[in-house]
Design a protein with these regions (language model features):
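Bacterial lipoprotein signal-peptidase II cleavage site
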Residues: 18-39
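Extended ligand-binding regions for polar small-molecule ligands
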Residues: 23, 83-92, 171, 217, ...
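Extracytoplasmic small-molecule ligand-binding "clamshell" domains
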Residues: 41-122
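Short helices/loops that flank or line small-molecule/ion binding pockets
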Residues: 91-92, 100-101, 105-119, 132-134, ...
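A ligand-binding cleft/hinge motif common to bilobed small-molecule-binding domains
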Residues: 123-131, 176-179, 202-203, 207-236
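Periplasmic-binding protein-like
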Residues: 141-148, 213, 217, 221-259, ...
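Flexible hinge/capping segments at coil-to-helix
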Residues: 148-165
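Ligand-binding clefts/hinges and TM-proximal coupling segments of bilobed small-molecule sensing domains
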Residues: 172-192, 227-231, 259-280
Length: 280
C-alpha cells in the first residue's frame, strides 16, 4: 500500500475551560514538556503514578481537536464530551485538568516521556494501546466509518481500490484501512488530524476518509460545514477508553470515578448532550 505523509503545521492554541471548583487550562505539548521538567521533584517523591499526578495538582491531558470530544464552540469556549467528562473525573480526584494538544501519532511517546499524564480523546481501546499503556474500562461506543462526497458511487470498500483514501496518522481509522483487503490497495494518505480528512474529501483531493463515527455524526450532513459529505459504510465497532503510563494506578482511580458518575447520572447526561452511546 502506497503511503504518503502530508505535513501539518498547527498554531499553538491558548484556550480556557471553566471547570467545577476552578478553571481548567489548555496549552501545547511544548509547555507540557516544561511542566514535566518542573515536576521532577514530585516524581522523585511520589509513591505511585496517581500520587505523582495528585502531587502536581494538574494532570496533563493529551488531546486532539475534534467535535464532539474536544473542540471550541461558537462562543469560543473549549468544550466537548471528553472535556466535560475529564473535568468531572478530575473533580472527583481532587485535581484540576490541564488540556494539551498533541500529535496523535506520537501519543504514547509523549505519555512515556511525561509530557502528558494521560491520553483522553476518543481513544479506541486497541490491542496496541492496551499492551503499551494502562487503560481504563470502556466508557463510550464508536465505530470506524467510510465518508465520501454526495453523489459518489459506493457499494463496498472494493470501490476504493486504487482511489485516494485518508485517515488520521496513528488512528483506528488508519488501522482499519491497513486491515481491510480492499482499502489496503488504496492510495493511502495520512493526515495529522481527523478534521483534515473531511477537508480533503470535501475539496475533492481524496475520494474517501475513514474516521470515527462520533466525529462524522457531529460534523457532516445537513446543517454542518460539510453538508455534502455522507457516511456510506461502517467498518467495525469499537470502544473508547483513557490511557495512562504502563503500570499506572491512575487508570483504576478513573474507573472508580466513572462508576460514581454513572451512578449519579452525570455520564448518561453527557452522553445525551453530545449524542453518544455509552459502553455496556
Amino acid at each position: 500500500m502506497k503511503r504518503l505523509v502530508s505535513a501539518f503545521l498547527a498554531g499553538a492554541m491558548a484556550l480556557s475551560l471553566a471547570a467545577c471548583g476552578g478553571a481548567a487550562s489548555t496549552s501545547t505539548a511544548a509547555s507540557a514538556s516544561a511542566s514535566a521538567s518542573g515536576s521532577a521533584a514530585v516524581s522523585q517523591t511520589a509513591g505511585s503514578d496517581l500520587d505523582y499526578i495528585k502531587g502536581k495538582g494538574k494532570p496533563v491531558i493529551g488531546y486532539t481537536v475534534y467535535e464532539p470530544m474536544h473542540y471550541t464552540d461558537a462562543d469560543g469556549s473549549f468544550t466537548g464530551f471528553d472535556t466535560e467528562l475529564a473535568t468531572a473525573v478530575c473533580e472527583k480526584l481532587g485535581v484540576e485538568p490541564e488540556f494539551v494538544e498533541i500529535n496523535w501519532d506520537t501519543k504514547v511517546v509523549e505519555l512515556d516521556a511525561k509530557s502528558i499524564d494521560c491520553i483522553w480523546n476518543g481513544m479506541t481501546l486497541t490491542d496496541d494501546i492496551m499492551q503499551n499503556a494502562a487503560t481504563t474500562k470502556a466508557y463510550a461506543k464508536n465505530a470506524q466509518v467510510v465518508v465520501v462526497k454526495d453523489g459518489t458511487d459506493y457499494t463496498s470498500t472494493a470501490d476504493l481500490v486504487g482511489k485516494t483514501v485518508v485517515a488520521e496518522a496513528g488512528s483506528a481509522g488508519e488501522a482499519a484501512i491497513e486491515g481491510d483487503e480492499n482499502l489496503a490497495q488504496a492510495d493511502y494518505v495520512s493526515k495529522s488530524v481527523q478534521t483534515d480528512c473531511l477537508m480533503e474529501v470535501a475539496a475533492g483531493t481524496a475520494d474517501a476518509a475513514v474516521l470515527d463515527l462520533t466525529l462524522a455524526n457531529a460534523m457532516i450532513g445537513e446543517g454542518t460545514d460539510y453538508a455534502d459529505l455522507k457516511i456510506v459504510d461502517e467498518l467495525n465497532a469499537e470502544e473508547y477508553g483513557v490511557a495512562f503510563r504502563k503500570g499506572s494506578d491512575a487508570a483504576a482511580a478513573v474507573d472508580e470515578a466513572f462508576d460514581a458518575l454513572k451512578a449519579d447520572g452525570t455520564l448518561q447526561a453527557l452522553a445525551d448532550k453530545y449524542d453518544l452511546a455509552l459502553a455496556d
